[in-house]
Design a protein with these regions (language model features):
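A structural "domain/chain start" motif
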Residues: 4-73, 182-194
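Surface-exposed short loop/turn segments
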Residues: 7-20, 86, 90-141, 151-153
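Short, well-structured alpha-helical interface segments that form or flank functional binding sites
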Residues: 74, 97-99, 168
């Protein structure tokens, strides 16, 4: 079991999500639409300055895990990629062309390690509140909490281990978003919602 690199140095990572063009989700069953995607960072002030912690063998925090990009940009790019991959257009501000407005409040984007006797457990959590509003019926909103998690066992824990754990949790978050029946229902035309 090795935690490679100096545990006293911050780890800089670049988490991301890439949509698989050969794999679509239930979002593809919807009529193509223009979606305004708004991302807000609701994390605590302690968690806003980093996206995780490196822990030593005693469980104490030895360094921070820092993202090379703002968390709001990571979420915007991930959800945009998934919506685009399923035939929808994403814009950053509501307009007359907008069918739905999706507001995402990021509550958690976090990774850390736990040293065990024979291995290192890498954990990550991605959690956000999703609100979908219909332009034609602004009073009609859907609010849902979506979470993605990852727990991976490793023998070595370098910077890439933290990034891989967050990428796995982010992928799970996007999959949950794209397959959630309440979210799909909120995207449907009000006349056809069931």
């Amino acid at each position: 079991m090795t935690n490679t690199g100096c545990l006293l140095l911050n780890a800089e990572i670049n988490p991301s999500y890439t949509a698989d063009p050969l794999q679509t989700s239930r979002l593809k069953t919807l009529q193509p639409m223009t979606v305004a995607l708004l991302i807000e960072d609701l994390r605590t002030s302690d968690e806003r300055e980093c996206v995780g912690q490196r822990r030593n063998g005693y469980g104490g925090v030895s360094a921070k895990v820092i993202s090379g990009r703002p968390v709001t940009s990571i979420f915007y790019d991930a959800l945009s990629a998934e919506l685009n991959n399923n035939g929808h257009t994403v814009i950053s501000e509501p307009s007359d062309a907008t069918s739905r407005t999706v507001k995402v409040g990021v509550k958690r984007f976090w990774t850390e390690n736990q040293m065990n006797f024979f291995d290192i457990t890498m954990s990550a959590t991605v959690d956000a509140e999703v609100v979908i509003q219909d332009r034609n019926a602004p009073a009609t909103t859907m609010k849902r909490s979506i979470t993605g998690t990852a727990d991976e066992s490793r023998q070595f824990a370098g910077e890439s281990a933290y990034q891989d754990a967050l990428n796995t949790a982010l992928h799970e978050f996007v999959r949950s978003f794209a397959r959630d029946s309440e979210i799909i229902k909120a995207f449907r035309d009000p006349a056809t919602r069931q």
